[in-house]
């Protein structure tokens, strides 16, 4: 395109997307964290038996995927998230995938530690 004797090029940049999945240990369920654009995360439930996906909730913030765990049967997700805004700033929570609504919530306040893992369906170990 030419504008007033100058060559002008439009540069289109596609945002990068990162995917991270956690598989349930005793069922055909997984959760997929779709991160991007920027500070947005989408939670997706994946039925690996029939390869179907259920879109869930978006979070404007950050989920630290490597500090998350799925219950052995895939019914519950333990996650560590942050938006670094008051009042919580960061927190660990348990939800039912593909949603992030907290069934249990532990405020953290910073980015050190956080999250945890399932020892069984009804027992967790927090990293607070």
Go through each PLM region and give its residues.
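Sequence signature of WD/YWTD-type beta-propeller architectures
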Residues: 2-128
């Amino acid at each position: 395109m030419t504008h007033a004797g100058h060559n002008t090029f439009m540069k289109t940049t596609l945002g990068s997307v990162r995917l991270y999945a956690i598989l349930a240990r005793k069922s055909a369920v997984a959760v997929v964290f779709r991160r991007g654009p920027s500070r947005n995360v989408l939670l997706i439930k994946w039925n690996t038996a029939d390869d179907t996906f259920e879109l869930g909730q978006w979070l404007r913030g950050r989920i630290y995927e490597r500090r998350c765990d799925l219950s052995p049967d895939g019914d519950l997700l333990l996650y560590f998230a942050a938006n670094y805004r008051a009042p919580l700033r960061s927190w660990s929570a348990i939800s039912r995938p593909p949603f992030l609504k907290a069934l249990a919530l532990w405020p953290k306040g910073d980015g050190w530690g956080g999250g945890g893992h399932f020892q069984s369906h009804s027992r967790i170990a927090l990293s607070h």
